[in-house]
Amino acid sequence: MPSFARIDGTNTVTDIFTLDNQDCLDASGNHSSTIGAAICEQKKAGTWIESAEKNKEGLRGNYAGIGHTYMTGVQTLGVASTDIFMPQPPYPSWTGISTISAEWLPPITRPTETDAEVASHKNYNWDESAYQADNAQGWVLTV
């Protein structure tokens, strides 16, 4: 079932509508985002962007959610310029977006656990306070 996100003037998602598949078909029986967006517009005025088509993965990197941001001209998902929906970053310092997947990147690359650390059930977790105190730090090894 296709879903559509309504965005406000700051490109923040404010509403989500899910439509029946047949509601988005053109006269030839092909899926049409334009038709779906027009149906959403009739229900609630605003700018509507398709988030997911039928039962497929999110069309724009992530499924849209309330509070997510719609971004255009982003180099991600293996293409030079695309549009995506992004949740808020998990931490204030995470401002970069992966060029491979539509996800936020930390300012410092996550270290890889050694075999001994894995065997001891240790892993690296982000510590925003540590990063804010010293921008060369951020990943903390925890149990």
Residue spans for each PLM region:
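Interaction-interface detector
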Residues: M1-V143
